Amino acid sequence: MTRVVLAPDSFKGTVAAVEAAVALAEGWASVEPEAEFVHRPMADGGEGTVAAFEAAVPGAVRMPLAVDGPAGVRVDTFWLLLPPTVDAPDGTGVIDLASTSGIELLQELRPWDADTTGLGQALAAAIDHGVSRLVVGIGSSASTDGGTGMLSALGARFLDATGVPVARGARGLADIASVDLTGLRAAPDVRVLTDVTNPLTGPRGAAAVFGPQKGLRSVDDIAIVDDGLGRLAELLAIDPAGPGYGAAGGTGAALVAWGGELAPGAAEVAELIGLADALSDADAIITGEGSYDGQSGDGKVPSFLANLAAEAGAVAMLAAGRVTADADTSSFADVASLTALAGSSEAALAEPVRWLRAAGAVLARTAAARTASARTASAGEPS
């Protein structure tokens, strides 16, 4: 009987990690019904982070709340309460920016006035509950506000030269003359999950690299926001060159200023959901994501899990929506591309669950063939 750990990331825009894991297991079981499956859907701090913890941690409880979304419209969401542990005797709150201030919550891009107020409101709710620790995923952001909305919801004030609060979002950054942190709520232990290493400002900064995704189109607009983020860094007394400070439109920097610690998303999630223990007696692990390409390197879920599998002596396998020509798949014993199985990317996107099941079946067959081949080779060796 084969023991398979299922640990895909989300297939962004199509299938959540939890659903992907189920579909892969169903496909494998169609070939090997007696196989044993351990579900550990993964995330790297972006979309699906809360769902990964909810699926992996027994006793996790959803805590519903309504927050001001990135456009100021109320959004019904939740944060996740994890049971008490030795390190967190009053429990851990898991919150992701994607479900409170994420770009998927917008009807249209709002580069100047989208902000992170909702994230701050969710953090405040978890603090009110009394948690010992916060785990915050900050992928999929909608704004480049430098985390000012989040900090404002936690009690900070960002003022112009006349002492009046500045406008929300990136629009207000250029007008910030002073920051009042006297009302800022104290931070518990805060771990910030991100796979981004970009600094806050400069050519690799939040505005230059990620601003266009959020609607900042012109060079002049990017320069204005970049200057505003630099000024914010001065007022918060943080180094704008800090790795990861540019994550989520500068929210990474704001969380560090609040007292948080940035951590590689995939590694932190894997540790907190007990993935190493799950792999200790596993034969194989299947991971995956929507697009496995030349950028799917260190820090991304599939590459991280391939290394973890090697350490545990398990076979690493990959199922991806597509696998590009520049992708390095040498860490995986077997690879299944949904696009190749479906015949086109359009067909794969139209029925992702169907083709994930097909990928699971393909991987089961190739694993069985490899095992049979190894047995044959072993039987032929002189005793």
Question: Residues of each region from the PLM?
Answer:
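N-terminal loops that bind phosphate or other acidic moieties
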Residues: M1-I138, A142-S383
